[in-house]
């Protein structure tokens, strides 16, 4: 048991270490008073702190904590703070002593500006640098990002990364997708300004500048697209999604090169066609190092869903 208090604990997130240790961050309390706490467990299963450390104990609602990195190379706690009414994005560095390293409740990475912040992603660049990328509804839903170096934020309230319509919704599995590679960031958003809803893919350089058209590259849809996933290829990026062009949702694939040019047939290549609704779960390079990819998906067919996998090359064969 990592929390000695008899309270409500939930939304736990974890970060493992090569040494076998484990960092845990979670929410304690019930709305509207919720705090963020942290504890470290060593490789012997013993907690490193006598009592969990408060990442945030400010009045109000702090929520949705995540961890990025590890203790050895730099560990950061990221969470939303709704104590002031709008939702601020906050960051706290956790030191080698397993205690908060920055003063107070950490650094305000982005002021909420009375707009909801969703789908936050954090990517560590080096020991003292991280990217923050998120969806922000300060005026309309768009993807924003910023780079944090030590205590310096390049874009105080975030830099707008996408400019096209972003009709994200968890109801129809059309949430934005963000992929960080060695020196690029790719985004996939769902444009619902016309029917059918379709995907736009864009690429940012290491300074978060649009490398392609600011509206992104649109993928051709026959019916509404949903459940997208991006993965890196040798010459660009691949996008996989679900679409119902018949009775069920099948899985389709499109590939874009470094210049944002579509390289497969216009409406994509069909990867999976089953008797149920198919939703992509993961795409990973083949462990055989043969240049191919393992794809994993869920086939949702009565009476139960099934996890399946297959193998494909970069052209979708």
Ranges and model annotations:
Residues 1-317:
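Extracellular, repeat-based ectodomains that mediate carbohydrate processing or recognition
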């Amino acid at each position: 048991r990592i929390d000695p208090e008899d309270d409500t604990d939930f939304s736990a997130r974890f970060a493992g270490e090569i040494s076998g240790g484990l960092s845990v961050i979670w929410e304690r309390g019930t709305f509207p008073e919720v705090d963020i706490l942290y504890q470290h467990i060593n490789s012997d299963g013993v907690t490193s702190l006598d009592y969990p450390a408060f990442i945030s104990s400010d009045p109000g609602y702090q929520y949705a904590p995540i961890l990025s990195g590890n203790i050895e190379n730099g560990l950061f706690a990221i969470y939303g703070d709704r104590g002031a009414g709008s939702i601020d994005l906050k960051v706290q560095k956790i030191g080698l002593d397993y205690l908060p390293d920055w003063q107070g409740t950490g650094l305000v990475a982005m002021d909420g500006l009375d707009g909801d912040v969703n789908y936050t992603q954090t990517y560590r660049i080096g020991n003292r640098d991280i990217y923050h990328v998120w969806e922000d509804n300060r005026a309309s839903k768009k993807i924003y990002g910023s780079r944090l170096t030590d205590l310096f934020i390049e874009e105080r309230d975030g830099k707008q990364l996408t400019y096209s319509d972003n009709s994200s919704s968890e109801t129809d599995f059309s949430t934005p997708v963000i992929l960080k590679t060695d020196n690029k960031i790719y985004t996939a958003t769902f444009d619902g300004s016309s029917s059918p809803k379709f995907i736009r893919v864009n690429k940012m350089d290491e300074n978060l500048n649009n490398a392609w058209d600011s509206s992104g590259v649109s993928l051709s849809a026959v019916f509404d697209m949903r459940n997208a996933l991006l993965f890196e290829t040798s010459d660009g990026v691949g996008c996989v999604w679900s679409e119902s062009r018949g009775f069920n949702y099948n899985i389709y694939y499109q590939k874009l090169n470094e210049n944002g040019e579509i390289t497969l047939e216009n409406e994509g290549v069909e990867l999976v066609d089953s008797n149920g609704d198919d939703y992509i779960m993961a795409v990973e390079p083949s462990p055989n190092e043969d240049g191919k990819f393992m794809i994993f998906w869920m086939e949702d067919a009565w009476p139960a869903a099934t996890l399946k996998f297959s193998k494909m090359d970069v052209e979708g064969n």
